[in-house]
UniProtKB/Swiss-Prot annotation:
UniProt-annotated binding residues for GTP: 17-24, 81-85, 135-138
Keywords: Cytoplasm, Elongation factor, GTP-binding, Nucleotide-binding, Protein biosynthesis
Full protein name: Elongation factor G
Origin superkingdom: Bacteria
Source taxonomy: Bacteria, Bacillati, Cyanobacteriota, Cyanophyceae, Synechococcales
Gene it is expressed from: fusA
Gene Ontology terms: biological process: ribosome disassembly
Subcellular location(s) of the protein: Cytoplasm
Originating species: Prochlorococcus marinus (strain MIT 9303)
GO MF: GTP binding; GTPase activity; translation elongation factor activity
Length: 691
């Protein structure tokens, strides 16, 4: 079956902003005017189509990134309504990565908020072309040109209005289109009866001023246009439109539009602009990946290229496990077998779905450029590549770091234990940086993640989405142990309690292993000093001790153990005796090998206004941080540092208080480093006191 829309007429866009800028209402209106829904849903009524989880409808916020397809002016538009709550995990960035363009929604009253700065920088990181919709122009205090100034100054964007509001607050009656040089007056409350007319007399001077600025801004992005503009001081409507599109695609400019989604004004013009100015899949660089031989390759947006797609979200759903995919090349057909090249496992495609929020349209195939969902994938998780078995490729994927912080979690009522297990399993499937395990000593359930904020949000989701109330322990840092010297260790387990005794004797040589090697065991027993059947139990005893630690109860890493000697008894020796002897030898060896404690170091990047630079650097130093670099750009300071995770608890609150809410930071795991002796002694004595 041929594709319904040529690739040139496909738009994959995200609608992103800070909380309460009106993203979801904006998406609702887009769906209403494009005919996907026939009745408008209001977020505050709990009826919004994209807020399809019951918990979202209760709270009037968007928790998950809902993917919806619609059409406008004979174009397919796939929309992701992203959560406004931006935390520091990788989820939001992944959403950004599968988009080709973004509508950044700003509130006409609140303007640029700290959170909108975060969203903007994430779009910068993935070089996503964007346009701005200044929403809530009907609100008291709305000021379109003030928001334009904030975007230019605080976000350093070459933003230029392509529209102007006619009136504001309660008097918002229409919009001036500076490209067409026409006014659009809204005649009814539903926003369907729109009159295209001449610009009102009282707005002509302002419109002429901003149209001249628009022409100048557009001309500067293109050599041919600048020649025309210098000669005639005028650009035609077609030249303006093509210049704006070119400027958006090459990140040279950001068009500003305005309106009020809630009052049904400006949404159709916004849809026109999506079609006119945001990129199709063929307008952005082809996705890069690695072939099995390690060479780099690209996959062009083309139905005839080998199939490749990226799983960007996994969600539990009444219909089963939904895996959202972005199709980059080729065709994916229902019932086919594909390769998950990230895990090197085959998967069967049971059903293919295009989502229209709680409405689902089953399709026989997804094609290059599509956003859709797959049912039936058993082993695919967020960030995995799906491709053809004949032409495998692993698409650019994000490094998924190991968790560095853990907390014990238990349900408030014992009857909720099964619900808690299901909730944790479901959350872990969605987020690969979230891990669940059981502490072998206490039998407590332990959850681990990338930081305090990450775990707070997941625990909040357990309550909201799965109705499980949980008690959470204090955050624990995942320390590690290792050794710095070489030595011998010996363990002899001999017990006689009448009848058959127990006897095992193990001698080992211990030395530091290669970084990242974990636990390495070498058997050098010769001549049957210790029978073969006792070697494995001895190794098993060492491994278990290695996992539970020796000096402070943390896993021991990067150690090489060679079993060189030992003895046994024909009658009294057993596998259990050698397991215990192996553990004893390991502990003996570690104590002689200068054991040390390691702690996770975090790569911390702080962005603050220049005025706060001194106090922020001082605060990082007081947290045992090492400042590695700093830069100042237009009054915004960036500080790069490495700080122990143990010193970063509560930092988000502290940073907000030190910078009046204007500072933001990102934090990710860097490496393990030796803990200073005085700090290590305190940790060891505390843990030994608890054991």
């Amino acid at each position: 079956m041929a594709r319904a829309f040529p690739l040139e007429r496909v738009r994959n866009i995200g609608i992103a902003a800070h909380i309460d800028a009106g993203k979801t209402t904006c998406t609702e209106r887009i769906l209403f005017y494009s005919g996907v829904v026939h009745k408008m849903g209001e977020v505050h009524d709990g009826a919004a189509v994209t807020d399809w989880m019951a918990q979202e409808r209760e709270r009037g916020i968007t928790i998950t990134a809902a993917a919806i397809s619609t059409t406008w002016n004979d174009h397919r538009i796939n929309i992701i309504d992203t959560p406004g709550h931006v935390d520091f995990t990788i989820e939001v960035e992944r959403s950004m990565r599968v988009l080709d363009g973004v509508i950044a929604v700003f509130c006409a009253v609140g303007g640029v908020q700290p959170q909108s700065e975060t969203v903007w920088r994430q779009a910068d990181r993935y070089s996503v072309p964007r346009m701005v919709f200044v929403n809530k122009m009907d609100r008291t205090g709305a000021d379109f040109l003030k928001v334009h100034g904030q975007i230019k100054n605080r976000l350093k964007a070459n933003a230029i209005p392509i529209q102007l509001p006619i009136g504001a607050e309660g008097d918002l009656s229409g919009i001036i289109d500076l490209v067409k040089n026409k006014a659009f007056i809204y005649k009814d409350d539903l926003g369907k009866d729109i009159e295209e007319t001449e610009i009102p007399d009282h707005m002509k001077e302002l419109a002429a001023e901003w149209r001249a600025k628009l022409m100048e801004c557009v001309a500067e992005t293109d050599e041919e246009l600048i020649e025309v503009f210098l000669e005639t001081e005028e650009l035609s409507e077609a030249q303006l439109a093509s210049g704006i599109r070119e400027g958006v695609l090459n990140h040279g400019l950001v068009p500003l539009l305005c309106g009020s989604a809630f009052k049904n004004k400006g949404v159709q013009l916004l849809l026109d602009a999506v079609v006119d100015y945001l990129p199709a899949p063929v307008d952005v660089p082809p996705i890069q990946g690695l072939l099995p031989n390690g060479k780099e390759a690209v996959r062009p947006s083309d139905d005839n290229a080998p199939f490749s797609a990226l799983a960007f979200k996994v969600m539990a759903d009444p219909y089963g496990k939904l895996t959202f995919v972005r199709m980059y090349s080729g065709v994916l057909e229902k019932g086919s077998y594909v390769l998950n090249s990230t895990k090197n496992e085959k998967e069967r495609i049971s059903r293919l779905i295009i989502l229209k929020a709680d409405d689902r349209e089953e399709v026989d195939a997804l094609r290059a450029g599509d956003l859709g969902a797959v049912l039936g994938l058993k082993n695919t998780t967020t960030g995995d590549t799906l491709c053809t078995t004949d032409d495998p490729i692993v698409l650019e994927t994000l490094y998924i770091p190991e968790p560095v912080i853990s907390v014990a979690v238990e349900p408030k009522t014992k009857g909720d234990m099964e619900k808690l297990s299901k909730a944790l399993l479901s959350l872990a499937e969605e987020d690969p940086t979230f891990r669940v395990s059981t502490d072998p000593e206490t039998s407590q359930t332990v959850i681990a993640g990338m930081g305090e904020l990450h775990l707070e949000i997941l625990v909040d989701r357990m309550l909201r989405e799965f109705k499980v109330e949980a008690n959470i322990g204090a955050p624990q840092v995942s320390y590690r142990e290792t050794i710095r010297a070489s030595s011998k260790g010996e363990g002899k387990f001999a017990r006689q309690t009448g009848g058959k005794g127990q006897y095992g004797h193990v001698v080992i040589e211990m030395e530091p292993g290669e970084p990242g090697s974990g636990f390495e065991f070498v058997n050098k027993i010769v001549g049957g000093i210790v029978p073969k059947e006792y070697i494995k139990p001895a190794e098993s005893g060492m491994r278990e001790t290695c996992e539970s630690g020796v000096i402070a109860g943390y896993p021991l890493i990067d150690v090489k153990v060679t079993m060189v000697d030992g003895s046994y008894h024909d009658v009294d020796s057993s596998e259990m005796a050698f397991k215990i002897a192996g553990s004893m030898a390991f502990k003996d060896g570690v104590k002689k090998c200068n054991p040390v404690l390691l702690e996770p170091m975090m790569k911390v990047e702080v962005e603050i206004p220049e005025d706060f630079l001194g106090s922020i650097i001082g605060d990082l130093s007081s947290r045992r941080g090492q400042v590695e670099g700093q830069s100042i750009d237009d009054g915004l300071s960036k500080v790069q540092s490495k700080v122990p995770l143990a010193e970063m608890f509560g930092y988000a609150t502290q940073l907000r208080s030190m910078t009046q809410g204007r500072g933001i930071f990102s934090m990710e795991f860097s490496h393990y480093e030796e803990v200073p002796r005085n700090v290590a002694e305190a940790i060891i004595s505390k843990n030994q006191g608890n054991s």
